[in-house]
């Protein structure tokens, strides 16, 4: 029953390291896809057909069954590099985001702390409060580890110095 009511909307961006291409997809039962297509045709006004053609070729040369292990290695590298920092890392699985508690570092709001990280240290993070309907601030932020290893190592080095 549930399968007949499910819609998957996703992006190829992080999985294939092509975030700037802005190419996504939707998967749903036929009766739902028929309705999605009615709306979609009016919401998408420009499609990068060259990027679509490149992706359709590229997707045949990558083993998507290895993506889990690929991102696990990235997560483990980033976590290991941050092990001597004052950030408290939360367990993360099935994602390319690492949530970190920064309460041992600052009492600033998560929004202000993220602004400071970007402005003063050149490391981007997203405040978790923006995902909460009540904007509750638990002094937690998230980092994306869908980056090349050198970027992760450099970012962790900066974060360890905070």
Model region roles, listed by residue range:
Residues 52, 56, 71-79, 89-102, ...:
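Conserved glycine-rich beta-strand-loop-beta hairpin in the small C-terminal domain of fold type I
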Residues 2-72, 76-81, 162:
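Conserved core segment of the aminotransferase class I/II
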Residues 116-125, 131-162:
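PLP-dependent enzyme catalytic core of the Aspartate aminotransferase-like
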Residues 12-13, 87, 128-132:
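Short, solvent-exposed loop/turn elements at beta->coil junctions and helix N-caps
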Residues 29-30, 60, 101-103, 146-148:
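Residue-level recognition of strand-loop junctions within catalytic nucleotide-signaling folds
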Residues 6, 87, 123:
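Short, conserved active-site loop motifs that form the nucleotide-linked donor/cofactor pocket
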Residues 10, 97-101, 144-145:
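Short beta-strand segments
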């Amino acid at each position: 029953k549930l399968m007949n009511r499910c819609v998957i909307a996703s992006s190829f961006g992080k999985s294939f390291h092509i975030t700037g291409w802005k190419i996504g997809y939707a998967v749903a039962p036929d009766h739902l896809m028929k309705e999605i297509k009615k709306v979609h045709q009016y919401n998408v006004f420009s499609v990068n057909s060259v990027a679509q053609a490149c992706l359709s070729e590229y997707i045949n040369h990558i083993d998507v069954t290895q993506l889990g292990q690929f991102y696990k290695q990235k997560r483990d590298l980033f976590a290991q590099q941050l092990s001597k920092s004052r950030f408290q890392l939360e367990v993360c699985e099935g994602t390319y985001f690492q949530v970190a508690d920064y309460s041992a570092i600052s009492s600033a709001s998560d929004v202000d702390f993220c602004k400071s990280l970007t402005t003063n240290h050149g490391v981007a993070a997203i405040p978790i409060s923006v995902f909460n309907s009540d904007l509750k601030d638990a002094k937690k932020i998230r980092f994306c580890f869908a980056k090349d290893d050198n970027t992760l190592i450099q970012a962790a080095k900066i974060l360890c110095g905070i």
